Amino acid sequence: MNSKASEQPQVSPGDNEHAQDGSTSCAKNCARYTNDDASAALEERLPPLPPRPSTLSFLDEGYTSSRSIRQTSQVNLQAKATTAVSLTDIGFRQSSEGDGEDHSAPDFPEPLRAKASLNQPKTSKGSDAGDSTSIGSTIPNVELGEVENVFSDFLAAEPSAPQEDGSGLLQFPEFRADDAEDEFATEFEPIGDLNEQGENEELLLERWKSKRKHYLILSAAGKPIWTRHGDGGLISGYVGVIQTIISFYEDAKDHLSSFCAGDTKFVVITRGPLHLVAISRLHESDTQLKSQLEALYMQILSTLTLPSLTHLFSVRPSTDLKRPLQGSETLLSTLADSFTKGSPSSLLSALECLKIRKSHRQAINNALLKTRVGSLLYGLVVAGGRLVSVVRPKKHSLHPGDLQLLFNMIFEAEGVKAGGGENWIPVCLPGFNSSGYLYMYVSFLDLREDSGSTANETATKEESVAIILISTKKESFFELQGMRNAFVEQMDKNESIKIIKEAIKRGRPTTTDIVPGTVLHHFLYKSRANVQFTMSAYGPESSSTFRLRRLMSTYNDLHSSVHAKHAHVKVHHCVSQSTSSFAWVTPRFELYCVASPNANRNALAQSASKIVQWVQQEEERLFIIGGAVF
C-alpha cells in the first residue's frame, strides 16, 4: 500500500474548527458573560498548523471520476489534530508523585489568574519520577473574592426575576427538553418486517415516524443504500421526496444544507456520489449533525476506500452499494446509535484516555517499543474505548476520527470480539489515507485472571482491553501475533495488566471526589492542544439512557451556543427548570458543567476553577502527551 506521510499536525487552540463557527446567538435561551480584563492574555495565538498529509486530499466534497481522484478536495474531518502527539514543548511545572490516587483539587495561595502564553520555561520531556503539571493556564484554588477577578462580569449580572406560571414552576429561559422517557426507550428497537401481504405496512410506517432520529444514505441517482430504521423499500416514498428536494437545489446550482419542518431538523451533506441525510427531533445543531454524517461517511470509506467507491459510481451511476457494504450495516448502526444516545467524544471531536500514572503509562509505552517488530505501523492499548497507550512512527499520526471508527468496530459492534481471541482485519483509515487498506491485528485480554489469556466473550465493554497492532503488510499476521505475545509477557512482568485492571475498576472520579461539597453534577473538560477530553462519572441524574440523552442535549446546546459565530465569550451560563449549565472556553481548554437549576453562581464559579486546577495537576495522568515514537 502507498501512503504519504507528513509531520504530525499540532493544533493551536485558535485553529479549533468549532471555535469560529456556529450560528445565531441564543439571547432568548442564555445569558453570556465576557471578561474583558482576561481576554488579552487568553487570546494569544499559538503557531499555525503545518500542512495536513497530502493523502487527505482524497476526501472530496463533490463527485469525481476515478481519473480525477488525485485532485479531490479535503473532507471536513472531525478534528484538526491527532491524539498521538501534542504540544510537548509547552512548559511544565514539576510535582512529586505520591503513592495514592488523590482526586481532590490542591490548594494554592496565589491569586486567580488565567494565562495563555507559551513563554514559559520549557522541557521536552516530563519527569520520569513524577507527573508534571502544565502551567499554561494556572487556575489556583482560591476564595470567592479572588474568583471575581476572572468571573467578575459573570458574578455581577444577576438573572432576571423568575416568573411563575399556574403550575408554580419557575419560568427561566430553558433549552428544549427531550420529552418522555418511555418513548425514548423504544428508540433503538427494530420496527419489524413487512409481511408477505403488506398488511402491516401502515403500522410499520407509524413506528418508523415515531423514531426521534433517522439517518439515510442514498446515491446521487436516488437509490437507498442504508437507513438506520426500516428498509429502503418501506420508506421509498420518503426517500423519493428527499431526493426530489436535493435535486431541485442542485438544478438551481444551489447547495441544500439543512431545513426544518416543525420541530424536525433535516441536515444534508453530499460526498462524491452519496447523499447523507440526518433527520432529528433531538436538540442538536446543524454543525453537530454534519459532524455525525461525516463520521458515517468515513465509516463507509473504511470499508470500501475512496477510489473503490468513486470507481463503482463512475462506471455505473445506478450502482447498488448494498452488496459492497454487506456486513458493514452493523457498524453504521452502532455508530449512529452512539450519536443518538449522546457521545461526548463526537461532540468534542476528541478522545478519552484511561487515567493512570505517568510512570505506569511510560512502562507500557516502553514495553511496546521493546517488543516492536519491523512491520508495525501503529500499536495501541485500549480499555473499554479509552486509550491507554499508543506507539507510532515519528512522522506519522492517527486522526481522532480514525480511532473512533476503530473503537466503534471493536467495542460497540462486537463483531470483532465474537470472532474469538484473535482477529485479522483489513481496514481503511480515511484520515490517514483514504486510498488503501491497512491490516489490523486485534487481541483481547482477560482482566479477571491478571494474565494474558484471551478474553471471555461475556466481558462487558468496560472490562474489555484490546491490543491493536496495525501494519501496511497483509502477510504480517504471525509477526504481529508474536509481538503481542512478547508484549503481554512484558506487561505481566511489570504488572501493567494489574495496573490497567485497577484503573478500570476505580472508574472515573465523581465531581465530589474532585471538589468536596461541589454543586456540580457532571462536567466535560477538553484539552484543545491534546485533542483529548476527560469527564466525571455519571451520577444518578444520568442513570438511564433517556436521562443521559437529556444531559448530552444540555451539553449540545451549551457547546453550540458558546461556539456560535461571533460569540466571542469566555464564560457562558444558562438556567432552565431542570438544570443550570456552565461553559468556560479559553485557547487552552473547554469546560462544560451541569448543576441543579438553583445552583449558586458563586459556587459554580469556584467549582469550575477547582475542576480546571485539578485537571492541570493530573494532566499527564488524564491525557497522553506525545506518546511513544520510533
Curated annotation (Swiss-Prot):
Bias (Polar residues): 1-13, 117-140
Region (Disordered): 1-63, 93-140
Major place of residence: membrane
The protein's name in its UniProt record: Vacuolar fusion protein mon1
Location in the cell: Endosome, Multivesicular body membrane; Prevacuolar compartment membrane; Vacuole membrane
Coiled coil, from the record: none
Domain of life: Eukaryota
GO biological process: autophagy; protein targeting to vacuole; vesicle-mediated transport
Taxonomic source organism: Aspergillus clavatus (strain ATCC 1007 / CBS 513.65 / DSM 816 / NCTC 3887 / NRRL 1 / QM 1276 / 107)
Stored InterPro entries: FUZ/MON1/HPS1_longin_1 (IPR043972), FUZ/MON1/HPS1_longin_2 (IPR043971), FUZ/MON1/HPS1_longin_3 (IPR043970), Mon1 (IPR004353)
UniProt cross-references to PANTHER family, sorted A to Z: SAND PROTEIN-RELATED (PTHR13027), VACUOLAR FUSION PROTEIN MON1 HOMOLOG (PTHR13027:SF7)
Bias type Basic and acidic residues, positions: 101-113
Originating gene: mon1
Keywords, ordered alphabetically: Autophagy, Endosome, Membrane, Protein transport, Transport, Vacuole
GO CC list: fungal-type vacuole membrane; Mon1-Ccz1 complex; multivesicular body membrane
Protein task: In complex with CCZ1, is required for multiple vacuole delivery pathways including the cytoplasm to vacuole transport (Cvt), autophagy, pexophagy and endocytosis. The MON1-CCZ1 complex acts at the fusion of vesicles with the vacuole, through its regulation of the SNARE complex during the coordinated priming and docking stages of fusion, and particularly at the stage of tethering/docking.
Topology class, membrane: Peripheral membrane protein
